[in-house]
A protein has these predicted regions:
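Gly/Ala-rich beta-loop-alpha elbow adjacent to hydrolase catalytic centers
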Residues: 133-141
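Acidic catalytic loop of the alpha/beta-hydrolase fold
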Residues: 182-187, 214
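Catalytic histidine neighborhood in serine/cysteine hydrolases
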Residues: 198-214
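N-terminal cap/lid segment of alpha/beta-hydrolase-fold proteins
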Residues: 19-51
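Short, surface-exposed "cap/lid" segments of acyl-processing enzymes
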Residues: 48-90
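Short beta-strand/loop motif that positions the catalytic acidic residue
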Residues: 172, 178-180, 184
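Alpha/beta-hydrolase fold nucleophile elbow
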Residues: 124-134
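Alpha/beta-hydrolase active-site loop
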Residues: 103-123
Length: 240
C-alpha cells in the first residue's frame, strides 16, 4: 500500500504549474429530494461528448463553522475534476444554505450524501462513482463511499483525525487518496501518516508542505495532487 508523504515522482515543474483551469461544463442548479426536505445542489456536466470514466460527488466541511458547497477547497476539488472531464455534483448538507432541515452531527448528513449518489448514478448509467470530501465532509463521504458498491474510489481532503474516530476505514479496501496539509490544525501529520499506512488496499497520502487545513497559498499543489492521482489511475483522462 503506497504511502506518499510528498509529491514522489512528480517534478518540481509540475508542482509549480499554474492550475488556473478553464471551465468547460454545463452548470445546473437544482434541488435533490433529501430525507428531511430538499437539498440545494450544483451539477457540472462536461461539454465533451464522451462517456466519462467517473462521476463525482464532493462533500463540504462542517456547516456549523461556515462550511458550504461553495467552500474554496471544495470548489477547487470540483474544478480539478471538471478539468479532467469528470461530472461533479456538489450539494449543501441539511440545514445549510437553501437545504432544508437541521445539522445532525454527521449522522443524517450520511443520508444526504447517499441521496447525492442516488441522484448522480442514473445521470451517468454504468459509470463508476468517486466520493470526495473536505474536513467534516471527508468523514461523511468516506463513511458513505466505503459502504456503497457504486463508489469505486475515494478522496479525503484535510482529514480531521485529531478528534474523529476513523476506525471504520480499516474495513475499506477501495482505492483512496488523502491530501493533507503538513501544518493542518485538525489532523496532526504523524497521526494521519500512521492512519493511512495501516489501511488495507491501495492508498496514497500526499502531504502538502507548509499548508494548513485550508491549503491557503497551496491550492496549486492541492489541485495537482488530485489530478496526478486520477491520471495515474485513468490514463484516458486529460486536462482541458
Amino acid at each position: 500500500m503506497p504511502l506518499n508523504s510528498a509529491f514522489a515522482g512528480l517534478s518540481g515543474t509540475l508542482l509549480l504549474t499554474n492550475f488556473a483551469m478553464q471551465i468547460h461544463h454545463d452548470s445546473q442548479s437544482l434541488f435533490l429530494n433529501g430525507p428531511v426536505g430538499r437539498l440545494e445542489a450544483i451539477l457540472w456536466i462536461p461539454t465533451r461528448h464522451e462517456v466519462p470514466p467517473l462521476a463525482a460527488v464532493v462533500c463540504h466541511p462542517h456547516p456549523l463553522f461556515g462550511g458550504t458547497m461553495h467552500n474554496k477547497v471544495v470548489y477547487n476539488a470540483a474544478k480539478t475534476l471538471d478539468a479532467l472531464g469528470i461530472p461533479v455534483l456538489r450539494f449543501n448538507f441539511r440545514g445549510t444554505g437553501l437545504s432544508a432541515g437541521e445539522h445532525d452531527k454527521g449522522r443524517g448528513e450520511q443520508d444526504d450524501a447517499l441521496v447525492a449518489l442516488d441522484y448522480l448514478a442514473p445521470q451517468f448509467p454504468g459509470v463508476p462513482l468517486l466520493m470526495a470530501g473536505f474536513s467534516f465532509g471527508s468523514i461523511v463521504g468516506l463513511r458513505v463511499g466505503c459502504r456503497d458498491a457504486r463508489v469505486t474510489e475515494l478522496i479525503g481532503l484535510g482529514f480531521p483525525v485529531n478528534s474523529t474516530d476513523v476506525s471504520f476505514l480499516r474495513e475499506c479496501h477501495k482505492p483512496k487518496l488523502f491530501v493533507h496539509g503538513a501544518e493542518d490544525q485538525f489532523g496532526a501529520r504523524k497521526k494521519v501518516e500512521e492512519v493511512v499506512a495501516a489501511l488495507p488496499g491501495e492508498n496514497r497520502l500526499v502531504i502538502v508542505e507548509h499548508a494548513d487545513h485550508f491549503f491557503v497559498g497551496h491550492l496549486d499543489e492541492f489541485n495537482a495532487a488530485i489530478s496526478s492521482w486520477l491520471k495515474e489511475r485513468h490514463p484516458e483522462l486529460h486536462t482541458v
